Amino acid sequence: MGGYSVTYSNFVKDPYKDWFPDDETNGASKILQWAYEVYGTDIVYACSFGAEGMVLIDLISKTQKNADIVFLDTDLHFQETYDLIEDIKVKYPTLNIHIKKPDLTLEEQAAEHGSALWKRQPDQCCYIRKIKPLEDALSGAPAWISGLRREQSVSRSKTDFINKDERFKSIKVCPLIHWTWDDVWEYIKDNNLPYNELHDNGYPSIGCIPCTSQVSDSSDSRAGRWAGTQKTECGLHTSD
């Protein structure tokens, strides 16, 4: 796999669109090697520290030991998520893990937009606390890495390894597109990786506390997010 440059301005299509990997990581390791060859340390991994995140952090650590990883701290995450981040810092001390917060504190957001904005206008809340901070974090970065998998949802089913990201005017690299939910957990268990203990208590997908619900059937890896609403994405992976 050649390390030739793919940028937002010259992107035509995923150069590996017709590649069907048959290695033990379903192509993830080779895509990460390509990404770090092309973009070096300028590429950023935006990690939510979910199950897919544990897989990617481990794979990235084997490819680029001083990689930059950004966590969008909305100030609304579960304590278990914050605890996991500290565990990851200990396990992978050479990785550069950055905590990115919104411009507004929760108190300032309430004063400006009203209390519990996530209930009344969840899209606006996601923009303030997740999308805008990631825009800032990716400013000047030619590419970023995401843990999207095709199996996760209809809206993610067409994701390629290398994508033109209209939202952030960047290249989005998605090494796990061919992974299933079972693949993710098999890798975690086989490699004895740390993970968020909420996964063992009915939380397949873990985000902010107000927008994450416990579910009885955890076979759907996106179940429990924005329950009772039509919302299925925070907006990081949509173009508008």
From Swiss-Prot:
Family in the record: Belongs to the PAPS reductase family. CysH subfamily.
Main location: cytoplasm
One of the protein's GO biological processes: cysteine biosynthetic process
Binding site for [4Fe-4S] cluster: C125, C126, C208, C211
Protein name: Adenosine 5'-phosphosulfate reductase
Compartments (UniProt record): Cytoplasm
EC number: 1.8.4.10
InterPro entries: APS_reductase (IPR011798), PAPS/APS_Rdtase (IPR004511), PAPS_reduct_dom (IPR002500), Rossmann-like_a/b/a_fold (IPR014729)
